[in-house]
Amino acid sequence: TMMGLLTGLAFGLLYAGLGVPVGKLADRANRRNIVAVCCTVWSLATMACGVAQHFWQLLIARMTVAVGEAGGMAPSISMVSDMYPRRQRSLVISLFMMGPHFGVLIGLAVGGWIAQHHGWRAAFLWFGAPGIVLGLLVWLFVREPVRGGFDGPAEPPGAAAAATESL
């Protein structure tokens, strides 16, 4: 159905398909910049969902949200990994990974209220706007952490590292 395309296939394929290439980019480029740009892109695209006048505009906006969101996770986890020593990483990354789940919980409750009182388009506009500010704040105030700053000597790559190296 059209709703399935908007909420599943169009979003999911792009999000999943871009995860590895963005992860590889995050290994080579400034992660802070990737996160800031992707946050801004997905926020602008979220707002574009609220002003879409046709199905195809909404579909393209949702696909653009997926592109932005796909670029946010790998660089963020990489940065968090470089900000904490190994013994604390599991806890810190677990706390970080709770964010999207709490976001969905809050988004459904608050978004439902906004949609009921102001229309579904307003919900997209209200939820997109803060991300633009957040992207700018990340760009201006978050520093790129030193890669491996808390790591000791490198360990030999395992089977997973060898397998992904060919990608």
Positions of PLM-derived features:
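MFS 12-TM fold signature
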Residues: 11, 39-46, 65, 130-134
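Helix-breaking motifs and short loop linkers at transmembrane-helix boundaries and internal kinks
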Residues: 30, 51-57, 68, 85, ...
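Cytoplasmic helix-loop-helix junction between adjacent transmembrane helices
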Residues: 61-102
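Helix-loop-helix hairpin linking two adjacent transmembrane segments in secondary transporters
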Residues: 96, 100-146
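Conserved MFS/SLC helix-loop-helix module at the cytosolic interface between two early adjacent transmembrane helices
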Residues: 17-53
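Flexible cytoplasmic inter-helical loops of multi-pass small-molecule transporters
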Residues: 143-167
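Extracellular/periplasmic helix-loop-helix junction of adjacent transmembrane segments
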Residues: 1-17
